[in-house]
Structures are given as structure tokens and as C-alpha cells.
């Protein structure tokens, strides 16, 4: 099959180009620009790479950044105090807390501490509630937004489509299920306790995989007309990463597929920055 590999980087670059123009307009009109605060706890190598990429892309479109790098040994209450400082800083448009956090920190308390109006990641319970209630307000998790944008690019009319999401995380599975329901898909969420997974995924028009298990889903899990969205990022050797789908053996057996890297990762960052711009616009009532 020719040209069935989805170039997430190219799609993300289109979004970034639009954001750059929009931010240039802000600067001319208001003499201000968005600013994203990134809270990084500890020195997890993978987290540091993700943060570096977010900062790089932010600067490319004209978003200022503030990196708040804190000790692994910080207490939950002290981290909340730091987040409250950022909440009160009128120069900060959006705030994200890089996950995962050390096990000693209460993640739910931290995500709830971020002001909902500055919640660029869309993880605050209020924003989660808006999404699942179908209220067009607040912020939606970036990876879920990125997945939906890719799906709609290749299947503009989702009415009645069968979508299967493998993985039930708060970052991908649950929010994406809400978004696809709003697009009138019939949505099935599968997880580690699902029996006969391939019998479910092989009937789907759209399969999104986000389980954190390298090369887990092979060709028999999909039908030839499927759009396959691979959200997994797994390090399988010192210098190689792979998704949750056996890409090399699946790519010729499906209609469209996202690669890893170069698929959903760039789209996630693009929508993080898009959320930050949205927060900035809301704050100054543009």
C-alpha cells in the first residue's frame, strides 16, 4: 500500500505555523505574548527530553517559557505552594507539570492544584468534567486532541464509525473516548483485562493503541480498512524507540497508520502549545 503512513510531524508543523502567525499578531496588537510554565520534578532522562522538545517548539512559535526544575525529594505540599505561585503570576498563561511524578508525590493533588484556566495539559478535574459532560469549555488533554485531529484528517465524517481504544488512561483513552463519542462514533475501550482483544480490534474502522507495550499488536489485530493510531513510545534499545504496534509488519495490512516516532508525538506538543495560546487569549479576552 502506497502513501498510507501518516506524517504527524508535517501535520503538527501546519498547526505550529498557524500559531506562529497568530502570536505575531498578539505581539503587534497587545505587546504581549503567551508564556508557558513547565514544572519538572527530578531528573528523569525521558522527562528531560520531552521538556526540551516542548521548550524548543514553544520558542519556535513565539511562546515564552519558564522551566521550574525541582528536587525529586520535594514534598507534595511544597510543590503545591510552587504551583500556587505560578497560578498567581499574571505573566504565566499556561502551566504543565511533567509526568510521571516521583511515587512519593500525590499526583492527583498536584494536577488539581493547577488553576483550571491555566491548565494547558487539560488534567484538572474541572476540565475533565467539562469534557465528559460535553461542555465546550476548558481544556482537553493534548494527546487526545492530537489523535482526533489525525483521525479527522483521514476520516472527516466519523458518524457511525466503530472506534476501538486500547488503553484506558486519563491522558489518552478516557478523554479520546469522549471526543470520539462527540463525533458520533461507536466507541469501545479495551484494557489489560479485555478478553479476545483481536476479535474486537479487527472489526474496527479506527484503532487507537496506548498501552506502553512495545510491538504488542500485530497484523491479525487489524482489518485492511483500519486507521491505526499508535500512541505508544517505548525504548527498545539504547538508540531506538518503538510504538505499541508492530509497525513494520502492520503498515502494509491497513489503510493508514501513524509511525513511532513521527506520528502522535509532534501532534501532542502542537496541541499543548495551542492550549497555551487559548489560555492566553482567554486571559486577555481576545
UniProtKB/Swiss-Prot annotation:
Its EC number is 1.5.1.5, 3.5.4.9. It holds the Pfam family THF_DHG_CYH_C. The keyword Hydrolase applies. NADP(+) binds at residues 167-169, 192, 233. Gene3D superfamilies: Leucine Dehydrogenase, chain A, domain 1 (3.40.50.10860), NAD(P)-binding Rossmann-like Domain (3.40.50.720). One of its GO terms (molecular function) is methenyltetrahydrofolate cyclohydrolase activity. Pathway: One-carbon metabolism; tetrahydrofolate interconversion. It comes from the Bacteria. SUPFAM superfamilies: Aminoacid dehydrogenase-like, N-terminal domain, NAD(P)-binding Rossmann-fold domains. It catalyses: (6R)-5,10-methylene-5,6,7,8-tetrahydrofolate + NADP(+) = (6R)-5,10-methenyltetrahydrofolate + NADPH; (6R)-5,10-methenyltetrahydrofolate + H2O = (6R)-10-formyltetrahydrofolate + H(+). Keywords: Amino-acid biosynthesis, Histidine biosynthesis, Hydrolase, Methionine biosynthesis, Multifunctional enzyme, NADP, One-carbon metabolism, Oxidoreductase, Purine biosynthesis. CDD domains: NAD_bind_m-THF_DH_Cyclohyd. One of its GO terms (cellular component) is cytosol. InterPro entries: Aminoacid_DH-like_N_sf (IPR046346), NAD(P)-bd_dom_sf (IPR036291), THF_DH/CycHdrlase (IPR000672), THF_DH/CycHdrlase_cat_dom (IPR020630), THF_DH/CycHdrlase_CS (IPR020867), THF_DH/CycHdrlase_NAD-bd_dom (IPR020631). One of its GO terms (biological process) is purine nucleotide biosynthetic process. Belongs to the tetrahydrofolate dehydrogenase/cyclohydrolase family. HAMAP family: THF_DHG_CYH. Catalyzes the oxidation of 5,10-methylenetetrahydrofolate to 5,10-methenyltetrahydrofolate and then the hydrolysis of 5,10-methenyltetrahydrofolate to 10-formyltetrahydrofolate. Homodimer. This is Bifunctional protein FolD. It comes from Rickettsia prowazekii (strain Madrid E). The gene is folD.
Amino acid at each position: 500500500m502506497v502513501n498510507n503512513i501518516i506524517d504527524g510531524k508535517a501535520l503538527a508543523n501546519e498547526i505550529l505555523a498557524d500559531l506562529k502567525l497568530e502570536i505575531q499578531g498578539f505581539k503587534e496588537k497587545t505587546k504581549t505574548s503567551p508564556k508557558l510554565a513547565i514544572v519538572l520534578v527530578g531528573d528523569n532522562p525521558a522527562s528531560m527530553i520531552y521538556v526540551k522538545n516542548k521548550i524548543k517548539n514553544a520558542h519556535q512559535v513565539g511562546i515564552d517559557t519558564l522551566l521550574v526544575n525541582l528536587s525529586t525529594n520535594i514534598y507534595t505540599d511544597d510543590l503545591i505552594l510552587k504551583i500556587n505561585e505560578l497560578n498567581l503570576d499574571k505573566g504565566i498563561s499556561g502551566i504543565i507539570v511533567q509526568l510521571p511524578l516521583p511515587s512519593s508525590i500525590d499526583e492527583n493533588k498536584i494536577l488539581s492544584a493547577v488553576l483550571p484556566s491555566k491548565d494547558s495539559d487539560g488534567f484538572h478535574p474541572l476540565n475533565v468534567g467539562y469534557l465528559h459532560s460535553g461542555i465546550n469549555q476548558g481544556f482537553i488533554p493534548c494527546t487526545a486532541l492530537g489523535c482526533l485531529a489525525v483521525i479527522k484528517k483521514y476520516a472527516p465524517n466519523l458518524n457511525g464509525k466503530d472506534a476501538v481504544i486500547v488503553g484506558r488512561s486519563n491522558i489518552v483513552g478516557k478523554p479520546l473516548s469522549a471526543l470520539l463519542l462527540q463525533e458520533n462514533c461507536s466507541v469501545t475501550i479495551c484494557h489489560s483485562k479485555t478478553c479476545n482483544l483481536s476479535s474486537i480490534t479487527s472489526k474496527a474502522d479506527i484503532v487507537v493503541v496506548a498501552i506502553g507495550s512495545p510491538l504488542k499488536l500485530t497484523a491479525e489485530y487489524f482489518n485492511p480498512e483500519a486507521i491505526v493510531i499508535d500512541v505508544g513510545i517505548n525504548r527498545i534499545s539504547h538508540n531506538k524507540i518503538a510504538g505499541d504496534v508492530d509497525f513494520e509488519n502492520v503498515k502494509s495490512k491497513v489503510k493508514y497508520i501513524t509511525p513511532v516516532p513521527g506520528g502522535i508525538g509532534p501532534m501532542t506538543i502542537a496541541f499543548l502549545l495551542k492550549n497555551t495560546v487559548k489560555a492566553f487569549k482567554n486571559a486577555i479576552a481576545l
